[in-house]
């Protein structure tokens, strides 16, 4: 006889789902960060099912906006992301996924999707008078 799967195993916990503020496509931004160095590795998107899979498996699963399908980081490349912690931001519209990244995180082969992509920015200093 096959094992019985509870409805809770098939859905994201109601306590978590109620706290998420999704965009019009039902997605939440997921910032992925190396757990020990705090290096920002990439940004992906998750719906409830991608988050449920991530929390249950310990490997990061995203929802591809362009392909409209789930993908688990590293299944093709071998560059897996092992989950260390997941946090929800104060507004409930973004996740911070702390991982142990094995190999490059970016599909271009770089460690981070943000490597060498700094935009030129200049902010002029502003003097603020101290309050007496």
Curated annotation (Swiss-Prot):
Enzyme class name: hydrolase
Record's subcellular location: Cytoplasm
Name of protein: Phosphoribosyl-AMP cyclohydrolase
Record's keyword annotation contains Signal: no
Gene that encodes it: hisI
Primary location: cytoplasm
Binding partners and assembly: Homodimer.
Cofactor: Mg(2+); Zn(2+)
NCBIfam families associated with the record: PRK00051.1
EC number: 3.5.4.19
Protein origin, superkingdom: Bacteria
Protein residues bound to Zn(2+): 90, 106, 113
UniProt-listed Pfam families: PRA-CH
Note accompanying the cofactor annotation: Binds 1 Mg(2+) ion per subunit.
Pathway annotation: Amino-acid biosynthesis; L-histidine biosynthesis; L-histidine from 5-phospho-alpha-D-ribose 1-diphosphate: step 3/9
Source organism of this protein record: Renibacterium salmoninarum (strain ATCC 33209 / DSM 20767 / JCM 11484 / NBRC 15589 / NCIMB 2235)
Record's catalysed reaction(s): 1-(5-phospho-beta-D-ribosyl)-5'-AMP + H2O = 1-(5-phospho-beta-D-ribosyl)-5-[(5-phospho-beta-D-ribosylamino)methylideneamino]imidazole-4-carboxamide
Binding site for Mg(2+): 89, 91, 93
